[in-house]
UniProtKB/Swiss-Prot annotation:
DNA-dependent RNA polymerase (RNAP) catalyzes the transcription of DNA into RNA using the four ribonucleoside triphosphates as substrates. This subunit is involved in DNA promoter recognition. This is DNA-directed RNA polymerase subunit Rpo2. Part of the 13-subunit RNA polymerase complex. GO terms for molecular function: DNA binding; DNA-directed RNA polymerase activity; ribonucleoside binding; zinc ion binding. PROSITE patterns: RNA_POL_BETA. Its EC number is 2.7.7.6. The lineage of its organism: Archaea, Thermoproteota, Thermoprotei, Sulfolobales, Sulfolobaceae.
Amino acid sequence: MASNLTIDERWRVIEAYFKSKGLVRQHLDSYNDFVRNKLQEIIDEQGEIPTEIPGLKVRLGKIRIGKPRVRESDRGEREISPMEARLRNLTYAAPLWLTMIPVENNIEAEPEEVYIGDLPIMLKSAIDPISQYTLDKLIEIGEDPKDPGGYFIVNGSERVIVTQEDLAPNRVLVDTGKTGSNITHTAKIISSTAGYRVPVTIERLKDGTFHVSFPAVPGKIPFVILMRALGILTDRDIVYAVSLDPEVQNELFPSLEQASSIANVDDALDFIGSRVAIGQKRENRIEKAQQIIDKYFLPHLGTSAEDRKKKAYYLAYAISKVIELYLGRREPDDKDHYANKRLRLAGDLFASLFRVAFKAFVKDLTYQLEKSKVRGRKLALKALVRPDIVTERIRHALATGNWVGGRTGVSQLLDRTNWLSMLSHLRRVISSLARGQPNFEARDLHGTQWGRMCPFETPEGPNSGLVKNLALMAQIAVGINERIVEKTLYEMGVVPVEEVIRRVTEGGEDQNEYLKWSKVILNGRLIGYYQDGGELANKIRERRRKGEISDEVNVGHIVTDFINEVHVNCDSGRVRRPLIIVSNGNPLVTIEDIEKLESGAITFDDLVRQGKIEYLDAEEEENAYVALEPNDLTPDHTHLEIWSPAILGITASIIPYPEHNQSPRNTYQSAMAKQALGLYAANYQLRTDTRAHLLHYPQRPLVQTRALDIIGYTNRPAGNNAILAVMSFTGYNMEDSIIMNRSSVERGMYRSTFFRLYSTEEVKYPGGQEDKIVMPEAGVRGYKGKEYYRLLEDNGVVSPEVEVKGGDVLIGKVSPPRFLQEFKELSPEQAKRDTSIVTRHGEMGIVDLVLITETAEGNKLVKVRVRDLRIPTIGDKFASRHGQKGVIGMLIPQVDMPYTVKGVVPDIILNPHALPSRMTLGQIMEGIAGKYAALSGNIVDATPFYKTPIEQLQNEILRYGYLPDATEVVYDGRTGQKIKSRIYFGVVYYQKLHHMVADKLHARARGPVQILTRQPTEGRAREGGLRFGEMERDCLIGFGTAMLLKDRLLDNSDRTMIYVCDQCGYIGWYDKNKNKYVCPIHGDKSNLFPVTVSYAFKLLIQELMSMIISPRLVLEDKVGLSGG
């Protein structure tokens, strides 16, 4: 039975998975959880708004989210579509309505539903109306029907919240201390709860004592004193709370001795309080210590006095882990193990952002209530509420990426270069580690990332290994309430920690018996003991498979010579992956199930509910024995991979034969696939993207992997199938350049269009001033000259289908003066500035679209889209799907190109030197497979591990009359002579990348200079010069060309004339009244002489003067001002 599950049948399971989940499900699930649960929880956390006024408070009720809408400048409201938000630079957001109940002197008033702000909507989420639309309706409102959603629209631009990778919070992670320090072993806990994170550190010093430190208390607190402050008083209770093992208990003697002078709770609290409330009364110190322990010590366990016992047992468990590490019973925790990582998705990040925004809202409302009541007005909540507090806080964070907690780059502009780059951006995972440090271990591929993170897709350079992408079938847990799972575990027979300690200390039971029991750890917290850990883990799995407990729960049983622990996890952010469950060597998913999947009778989720497929996190996978293939199954196996190639991410999945390439080549291709030009969105004609590229004739690859269809690449491809010859022809394809057939290019191969958007709005300024979009008149400041405005219509905007070039004005606009001074001195017309929008320097094109609309504030908004035809030319960059990139070195007409006996002429000629050292065998195999596909008309499957055998394809092309190694006899097109060697000819999919000569071509003679240094500006966008650097300078010094050196570094850079006093050597200044240069020291009593220097040198002298250093210039050959 096991061997019956063929690749095709398992592929049906994969198709079913993506049919029900999609590719950006992780963001949508997380955001949906936020709007359904977390939003109300944040309101309930607050509960009510207290005020300083006796008897007055406001109770908070349910929160409701409206439909996405825009509030127009005339105060009218109407629903909007995402496309309208994009075009009009609006935010796609919905109003939040909160029920408030004012309570005065315990008398509740009528509940009021109050508008408290706008919440940006994630496209295609549960609260987005378009998630329910049919394909036809989506097309009608201007959306790409295949767009996956998962991003926001803020001020008209698409922004994605990038998944953040973090160490798991609320877990005890032990490690050894730094060599040479006083600390031998440490434990770190990041206690994270609603709204804040508190790091707690436990240290074992060389003298055997344990100390705890956390932010609210300066210095380190001895562990035993903290235990007593938390309510566990006697030495015996403390020792048993830490461990039942006498060997571990013995390690606590130094700590108990150290704290022997402090015996009761108040003394312990006073010890802590004396560090925070210095010089205050004992009662105040104790009270302060209690507040700090409740609020800032392990807040995830609770913040009330009742939770102190829980905190004490948690601390004791952490100490026991440190002692076990010291005794050599356990290894230091691996921070890079994916069981110790959590991903923070849009929902979690939004929750933390909304919490801060809501707190600010509550603070403001409290102030407004008190102010209103003091003035004796009637309570009118709707008038007092300021909704812009919530709206602006959230919008600003999304628009800039600056999140609460000091994180930057959390939200990014969605990369729309092509379809793949967009999907990849939505599945990206960023580590919070600083990229400046080496962190080699963190960047390495870890075994637990198998099936969770793509092994190939990571950037080169400083972010390598820190920026990752989800593997195809990685799924992220949303999490369920811990209390439900805890209750279930106790019902299953787990004995609570306190009960076990009571039995041993008071009941007289044998502690050695309990030592054999397993510790049960729920989300990093020791909750009790169970006799047989293996049995408990299996019971939990059985109940999960039966659907009695949530499939979000994962369990791992860790057993070594000394450790026996059952870890149960149900928190959010764990990366999990689905596997087929195996029983007695047989997979539980049968052929009947697969037939039902195909017919649509059941879905992938049904298989999970039936207990045939389950999601494992990295911790539970430690217990799993997973077979890669059904044929490998033995009775010992617990799970079967659904499909091995699913370990790859989205971009690596499109590479044919990736297992035949050297690993870095696949990494390079993963980066380049995101730069290829194709069809980035089906609604490109309606969109106003800042910059966009469109390939005119994208083709589906002839050699495909199975994942292409799922990703949607076959509908939105980015490349062409090119006939490739591998030979050195003319030498114009040396060093990775390629020769391209000019005739193919003339027939339209790799033609693309580049779109650039220019936009401006009529801004209204305070004081009644405003911009005007008109044809500027000759009198305004900064007027460019009549020929620059020649293309504008009467309304000041260019017409569609007009040719433009760099410097031409597209939108005429005048603005009021920047400074009040100008306004007073000049007439209103003269004071106006020309702020017209001009075509970028060095760019050209045809006006494609003109959009005139208005923003939500009622300002006129004009957008002009310019298109430019890009025909492949020398220097444009291309790449195959195997990391083989190259630029066009020469375009040769078809008549001069080599041709085969059958008259086939290549589109691209690649130099053979590009292949041996790079070992991209995948490309050679793709050429053979592509040749077979072109001859037979059948698409070739090149899925990694499950490909059509290459030998089979070689036999096939032999039947069509071609050599199996794909080489052919070739004639030189220029001479007609036969070329001695046989030449490899195949069909390979090549991509045009967005690095084109037209965007980079740059030169300048004269041009703008910087204000400060008066040296030429830098960069193409600023019409900058080409830097003549230090090394170039050294060459000219070595060569001895003094005049050339002066020409480059002085005459054509920042030559300036200064006047120097011959007595004191200071730089003089020009006195307007006397009409001559004077010395700052001697006035007009000394002679000043002109000196030609570099302006940067003059600047240096003056900056030194500002630092009270007095450089003086000594003059040699003096030439007076009159030349005498």
